């Protein structure tokens, strides 16, 4: 079965990465069905030579099941030397070949962690920051404000983060 994503075509805001855009926040409403269009994830990813890292949070086509996904690619040999492993209820990356691991700081992290009824999905080590601060009763937004772009000049990779709440068979994100 092909996985589809729903993109909000009128509200998507692309903010260039980098130090000059610190503090810019984008909040999207949960109920924007009128502004959304269904697109094929496979088609979207295959239309670019380097999709990089990405997260998907949403629901199946019939709206009955929650969907959370994370994907990565790597430009450097160090970035390509990683695999996903289960870690409790979450996922983390680890070196495929530890002898080839150079700098683990931007490639070894937990992109998915579960805190109670919340599944946190991100493209970097901010997953741990969000998890730890939410565990101390801070909000998702408060946790995000403690972090900035990745220190990988000249790219300054944006930190992408999402959260899904599941409660009594219902879910929102």
Name each model feature, range by range:
Residues 1-35:
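N-terminal amphipathic/basic-hydrophobic helices that include classical n-h-c signal peptides
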Residues 28-173:
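Conserved short alpha-helical segments that host acidic/polar catalytic motifs at enzyme active sites
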């Amino acid at each position: 079965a092909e996985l589809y994503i729903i993109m909000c075509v009128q509200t998507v805001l692309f903010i260039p990465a980098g130090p000059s855009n610190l503090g810019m926040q984008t909040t999207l409403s949960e109920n924007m069905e009128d502004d959304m269009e269904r697109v094929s994830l496979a088609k979207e990813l295959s239309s670019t030579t380097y999709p990089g890292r990405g997260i998907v949070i949403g629901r199946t086509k019939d709206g009955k099941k929650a969907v959370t996904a994370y994907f990565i690619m790597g430009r450097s040999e160090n970035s390509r030397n990683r695999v996903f492993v289960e870690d409790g209820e979450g996922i983390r990356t680890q070196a495929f070949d530890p002898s080839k691991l150079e700098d683990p700081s931007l490639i070894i992290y937990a992109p998915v962690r579960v805190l109670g009824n919340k599944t946190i999905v991100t493209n970097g080590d901010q997953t741990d920051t969000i998890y730890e601060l939410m565990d101390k009763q801070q909000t998702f937004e408060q946790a995000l404000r403690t972090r900035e772009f990745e220190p990988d000049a000249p790219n300054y990779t944006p930190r992408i983060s999402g959260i899904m709440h599941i409660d009594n068979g219902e879910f929102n994100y």
